[in-house]
């Protein structure tokens, strides 16, 4: 018979059983429904009683195979027999039927969702508790609902949906990892239990993140699910199970629940993943072979979970019939997708009417349950089940339930938040972006932009020089908006400063966008209105500023270099002026000497002087002129006597210093001499050795080389290579003292000129901070100084002994460090006796002598010295300021423009 009523099959059944009008009776015994949902009913008996469900589509090629008899039939009364599907179980689905419930008045305390979905028996200490408050806070059943892992992220639910065309991301993602707990590779297959009708929008599905809220599903573990085993009796992982709502449910912000229209059908999709090849199901009676898998769909009431709401399905002729369980095939390691369409609730929820325009506080809700079963010998065993959040089922959709103006505005998941799924326009009715504001906007905080490198690709550094050129081409103008445009756009301040979009488009096209036509207040239409992206221009400014910083740094470096050169030029100018004044003084002194030493025959010069002073003699008497001449002659005589006295004193001082020469002239076998003549020049003092010289540490390589053989000791038949360095040094000293006694006035004038305040500011320290032998890290310090000669005031002499076990092929590297960038000149070097006499060694010596550096500059100066092949050697280095002195500079500028260093190396054979 055809079902035409709203309660349809169930109502007919209760009328047939004499229970008319008791559908809503709380005392109704629901054992028959419980038996149908949870017990292992007899499929054969149902097949003999129930007709097949006709296909609901004109094309039944995609219709799922239906279970004959295992459905909600249009039942007819039978005499003395309770239909098998409605036997009541009190245990698990695999257990035999037990006694039915005695009463339903206490369903709030002891309830059970049959078919193996919920088992919520309360006790004295454990009352029924609601589900997770974040999902469905009004469900009155105490069941555990752990989050099912989703395709996107485990535990995350898809956003709610309101549009019918919105589906889940699994529809387009190719069944990506639906169940992340199992990582076995799998393929995907899909089947559909419906053919889309003309108004179906299954072909226009959108990604989930662009949709409205979607109905949430959660697994229910109130009754233990049965496990699957393979042919080897190995337990398989839990079945991956996921239910997705395709369409038919709209979220109502006012009711804070999803609403389904009874006359409109809804559609759901189930994704099932089995791991391995299931052959057996584990029951309380042991292992049972699996014959087939089935899907069941039914509804339940939130306030009375024992009451089952039948689900109907529209047929091809627009009629409705009870939905039959769907027979499905599950392949190993594959995702099976089953789509159930054209479904309807057979009833509506109670208390749907509003009170004073507000939701009814006594509103009742349904929940939708989808279960997966394994069948064996007409018995069903629950494998997995999902239950939805609360649903309101209404008979129609009058205007009192939904306000069109609030259709897009919803409450967000975060407290005190409102969400709008669509475009928002302020002072405009045609927003073309997510938010369009015509008018001023105040932002007290900051505007954030996505900038994470993980969300970017093709990252390339821009040319800041090009950005600077583009910014230089942009024109900044002042302008006034037209009144009709300002009024239409909500602009209060018409006069502004900015850029012209057309000009910016020629320079930086990506910073200009067309936003369509804009209508002004007077009706004028501006076609293809241009707007400027100031963020792009701001980034161009950042690049231009970086380029300007580079240019500024380069200019600062060049300015610093120019300042250094200017200081050097000023220093040279002062030096040249001082030299010119000194030369003038020397010419005056020479001319005065020539006048005093000239004979009477050279009277012509006196006439010239008379002519020169002719103008003054007319004004001055003769005695004044004679007095001046006598005074000048007396001064010159005094200067000459002073010079002679200083010269004599210097000779005496030199005689005192000659006996105190360093022990380098000793001709004994203990310490070598530079020349035989040097020892004969002072036979009485050659053996004199100061105690300090004996305590000076030797230059030895015994720590890095074996010290077994003695080199260059004793010296026999040494070849004279050059004059003694000490003798030559004493000769230079005598020459310098002679020059100093003759030109004392010049040196005094020079030091006075250099002691001025201008020169003191540019003073350069030309002394050496440290000296060492690099190979052995031997420091040459003040203990090597020859105090008898000079060790300070611009002249330093070092007497350095070398160990007798030092090989002749050892390299001596002298490291000189200065505190300022200076130039070190090697003015002279003198080599003593050679430590070998073969021609081969002599050739090597000659080639070694040819290699000589002339100067180094900087802070660190390294000189390679030929010390080892000789019994003694002397080196003269001059440390000078740049561009102020060299080897030819007057020695009296020592300590001012340069500092001289003399190093005397000799082998100590004692």
Swiss-Prot record:
Where is the protein situated, by its record's location annotation?
A: Membrane
Q: Which residues cross the membrane?
A: 628-648
Q: Which domain of life is it from?
A: Eukaryota
- Mention any Pfam family matching this sequence: Peptidase_S74
Record-linked SUPFAM superfamilies: p53-like transcription factors
**Where is this chain primarily localised?**
membrane
Span list, region Disordered: 189-208, 661-682
Q: Where do the coiled-coil regions begin and end?
A: 543-575
Question: Could you tell me the membrane topology recorded for this protein?
Answer: Single-pass membrane protein
Q: Where is the Peptidase S74 domain?
A: 451-559
The record's comment on protein family reads: Belongs to the MRF family.
Protein name, UniProt field: Myelin regulatory factor-like protein
Task: Tell me the lineage of the source organism.
Answer: Eukaryota, Metazoa, Chordata, Craniata, Vertebrata
